[in-house]
Each structure stands twice: as C-alpha cells, then as structure tokens.
C-alpha cells in the first residue's frame, strides 16, 4: 500500500494475512509488487519450482526497468531475503532482516485509503421480515439503520471490488446479515482474490465443498 504522495519519508505498507503490518522501503515495495503481479495468475494452483524461478526472474527483470544500474543478482538476493522474511513473520518467527514496529494508528495519517472495507452482502431484513438462518437472542447486526438496504447484484459487487482495488484498499470483509445465504458467495470470493478476504458467518451453511 503506498503512502500519501506528500509523505516522502513514510514507508509503503504490506498487510500480511490481514493482521500483520510490515513496512517496506520503495525499492522493496516495487520488487514485491512486481513479484505479486506474476504470482496472481497462479491463485489456487500448485506452483512448480521452475515456475517459481521464472516468476522471480521476471519480477527482477521488471524491477531493473526502474533500477537499471542495480545488478540482477542483487535484486534476486533481495527478493529471496524479503520473501523468506515475510514467511517467517507470517509464522510468528524472527525474520532474517530487522523490521521496525508499526501500528495502524501511527501509520493512519500517511494512508491514502482505509486498510479494510466491510461489505454487507446479505441484508438483515427483507420486505420487513427477518432474513437470517438463525434467531439469536443477541445479534450485533440486528436493528441497524441500513439493515434493510436492498442487496447489490453480483455484477454490482464485482464492480465495487474493482473500485476498492484501484483505491488500494487491501482487505475486504464479507458480512451481513448472513453472507452464506447468497448463492454467489463463492463467485464473489473468487473475484476478491487480490484482497486479504475475511468472512463473518454463523457457519451453519459451511460445508467442506463450500470451504
């Protein structure tokens, strides 16, 4: 996530697994973005060692267009070090490089957009009737002002997801109501592959096939 253009000394921000904030300098942010662009077509697929090497080499070549005087070997080493460190951070281990502490509150003033957007896929009420597959004694979503707002169509949600992506909002939460009541939920999750995606659900309709 890039900082505001007038925040010259602010780092880029990587949101890792939705709960870890990792600051990146400009060169590493460009290198990682180029690698992620090449990784995206493999979403949900097994990546062979040769594919991995090809993606890394392509990301390095693309980054050299910005840093033409930086040796390929140095960029390749930086990419390997960065990815190894990110895996360690994701696993709660000590990374190979020093990573400064960063809180969302401290970084908020440098951001160009929110770090998360909650999307109410399913309304709490339809035509005045309760629209959920449970009737809990307490529901945090019940009685809210917009609880009966008409639901967007699949195409409208996809269009919104694209707008959120262009705005550099890295995380979306599918919520409701009960989002699993929508038959297009898998399609919307697939459309949200670019994001860190969360699902707020009571779990009643979750099956191994749906998961």
Which positions does each model-derived feature cover?
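Long, charge-rich, low-complexity alpha-helical segments
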Residues: 20, 24-119
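A generic alpha-helix propensity feature with a strong bias for hydrophobic helices
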Residues: 5-6, 14, 44, 71, ...
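Weak global preference for isoleucine
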Residues: 1, 15, 30, 47, ...
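Conserved alpha-helical substructure of the radical SAM core
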Residues: 67, 77-81, 85, 95-210
């Amino acid at each position: 996530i890039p900082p505001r253009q007038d925040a010259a000394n602010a780092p880029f921000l990587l949101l890792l697994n939705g709960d870890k904030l990792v600051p990146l300098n400009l060169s590493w942010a460009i290198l990682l973005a180029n690698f992620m662009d090449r990784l995206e077509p493999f979403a949900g697929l097994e990546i062979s060692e040769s594919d991995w090497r090809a993606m890394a080499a392509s990301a390095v070549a693309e980054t050299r267009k910005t840093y033409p005087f930086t040796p390929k070997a140095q960029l390749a080493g930086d990419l390997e070090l960065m990815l190894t460190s990110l895996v360690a951070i994701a696993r709660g281990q000590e990374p190979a490089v020093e990573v400064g502490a960063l809180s969302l509150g401290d970084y908020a003033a440098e951001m160009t957009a929110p770090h998360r957007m909650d999307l109410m896929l399913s309304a709490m009420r339809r035509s005045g009737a309760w629209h959920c597959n449970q009737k809990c004694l307490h529901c945090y979503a019940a009685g809210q002002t917009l609880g009966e707002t008409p639901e967007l169509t699949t195409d409208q949600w996809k269009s919104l997801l694209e707008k959120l992506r262009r705005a550099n909002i890295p995380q979306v939460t599918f919520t409701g109501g009960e989002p699993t009541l929508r038959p297009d939920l898998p399609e919307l999750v697939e459309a949200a592959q670019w994001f860190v995606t969360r699902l707020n659900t009571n779990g009643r309709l979750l099956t191994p096939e749906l998961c």
